[in-house]
Amino acid sequence: MADEIKTGAYICKGCGLGERLDCDQLATIAEREGKANIVQQHDFLCNAEGVAMIQSDIDNEGVNKVVIAACSRRSKNEAFNFENVAISRANLREGVIWVRPDDDESRETTQEMAADYVRMGCSEVKYMNLPNVNEEASSNDNLLVVGGGVAGMTAALEAAKAGYPVTIVEKSGQLGGSAAFEYKRIPEKAPYADPEDTGVAGMVSEIEANDRITVHLNSTTTKTSGAPGRFSADISTESGSTTTGNFGAIIMASGARNYDASQLPELGYGKSPDVVDQAGLEKLAMEANGGPIKRPSDGKEVGKVVFVQCAGQRSDKEGHLPYCSGHCCLTSVKQAMYFKDQNPQIDTNIIYSDMRTPGAGGEDFYRSGQMKGVTFTKGTVSEVSAGGNGLTVNFKDLILDQDVSDSADLVVLATGQIPNSGVDIDLPVTAEEDEAQAEDQVTETAAPEVKVESILNLTYRQGPDLPHLKYGFNDSHFICFPYETRRTGIYSAGPVRRPMDMAQAKEDATGAALKAIQALENAKLGRAAHPRSGDLSFPLFRKEGCTQCKRCTVECPFGAIDEDEERYPQFNEARCRRCGTCMLSLIHI
């Protein structure tokens, strides 16, 4: 019978298991107590011979439930990747012998512990069912990329090369993002000696020529609903027209904006037109187009330029950015080369507190700047003032430990990036206060208006945008889980995820595209989007036991649970990551 359950239990003797455990006794327990139909032992279950033994039982004996008593379920997933069977892993290596003393006194307890793991594995596999294919999402291979900058374009091109249709939504009237307004970029290829062309024009041409990529300019996503494999997004234009598209996964590459340098009056911004930020210098360089860069105030050629690093960032002062934006130091080196490459006699001085050169070739590019005559001064700038025929920069030289003044025709502030990450759903609009005090305040003054702008406009129970990490970046974890957000099937790439330069944004976008493809392919197969531990199943909800307390809808960290019209939990299995938070919050699930 096709529906007949036939369990096979396989016990490994490798990695010291055979020496530490009585595998014959474990086999007997699997057969008698675990009711396994087939029980076999092998010296090295994960090698080709052991895998072939299991596959033979699946093909010839009809085994459809497999218990592997060996190592952790996080190990050897490729070896034990059997199709169309339920697999339970009894962790005898990491969970038993590696955590138990290897002595005669502990041997009996170790054996009992291993026996319990075998019992649990046999019991678990009985109730495991293969995930069902989601027919609704089976044909949805489309990817939505929100943002048409370097990260967004790279993600779209990489996904299109893999054969997936892509839709780009860009709020401005052209592709390229901030990179479209840069004269040159930090080099991406050896010998990392000179600034390179941004390559934006080539990427735009490649996208326009690719029939798998659709571009919506002057557009935003005004509504996003659904789950991996079956997202639905309303794309609205400035004219008011709206189209609805269906997508398997979403990449959020909304980029970053420049810090508002007008908050730095002590550094002269807004007081003198000759004090600009890095974006302002890029504009001057593009206007010069390889010729002499001229200062905005009177159009004279710049003879001396000072770059002020960490302007308004890496600071605990109110209104400043507390973090490093990653690209600013090398961007200043690049911009100093604009002057040196045009005229080596121009005096270029970069005042820094700490010079940071991340990424491949960053140190080489920094040394190239030194070779071209760029001056680097370790110091902290206190004031930039205009007077006479130029600017005066007052700073403390941290090497000489004394206050110094320097003159300049032009001052460039390295002001940093702020992620375009939308509404932070984890932050309340107003401060939490005692109810009585709040009522008094309402009668006296109106609540302050908080202007927010959503990027995705999600219809999730938990809010319209992605939860943020520290400082507004919306990754789940920079190192352990890159690209992943707390909204399954939605991945972030580029400077909205963490501070980075153009080369890093391209690499980032490629990774996000691969993760998005993985999510939609798993959704087509009815699998969870994050099968790291080999578990492809989902929790089951008993509606008859629900008291409508809403704890599960609120506490799910991934927004997997909404509410239906009757106010019962509406479980979106494709959003679930099987963390078990809902099961802990409600024991009757």
Give the ranges of each region predicted by the language model.
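Residues forming the flavin
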Residues: A2-I587
